A protein has these predicted regions:
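Walker A/P-loop
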Residues: 70
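Charged, amphipathic alpha-helical linker segments immediately N-terminal to NTP-binding catalytic cores
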Residues: 1-37
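Short beta-strand-centered segment that lines the nucleotide-binding/catalytic pocket of NTP-utilizing
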Residues: 84-98
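P-loop (Walker A) phosphate-binding loop of NTP-binding proteins
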Residues: 64
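Pre-Walker A adenine-sensing motif
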Residues: 42-52
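Conserved small/polar residues in nucleotide/adenosyl-binding loops
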Residues: 127-129
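ATP-binding Walker
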Residues: 67
């Protein structure tokens, strides 16, 4: 029987390393142990228990800008790969933003708000991909 404790012992170093890479000097994650043990690992178990080797599973994560979607999905991906030995592909809206240089040009030529990621018009269109 797989357990949260067993999983935590196998993934904690990688999780903490990833979290450290996301922290800044002024913004630190609080309650990292609790976040991993009480939320991220149980969610990973939930996903793993519903996975079917015959079909591709798609899991979506929604939330506002800066709410931790990338951090959460990256750590869950890490847990699913390392502990459950799943093949995981993660994609983020961040992967489809125009470059900073492109957004700067748009902000000068069209509107200053286009410098900010997330504003309509700052994503690559399917034609450009």
């Amino acid at each position: 029987m797989q357990s949260v404790t067993e999983c935590y012992s196998k993934v904690k170093k990688d999780c903490f390393r990833y979290i450290a890479s996301q922290e800044t000097r002024t913004e630190k994650f609080k309650n990292k142990d609790k976040m991993i043990k009480s939320f991220l690992i149980p969610v990973s178990f939930y996903i793993a228990n519903r996975a079917n080797k015959e079909k591709t599973m798609i899991v979506g994560l929604a939330g506002g800008q800066g709410t931790g979607k990338t951090t959460i999905s990256s750590i869950i991906k890490m847990i699913l790969e390392k502990y459950f030995k799943f093949n995981v592909f993660k994609i983020s809206i961040d992967d489809f933003y125009k470059t900073r240089k492109e957004r700067l040009k748009l902000s000068k030529n069209i509107h200053p708000l286009l410098m900010t990621r997330g504003v309509p018009g700052t994503h690559l269109s399917l034609i450009h991909i």
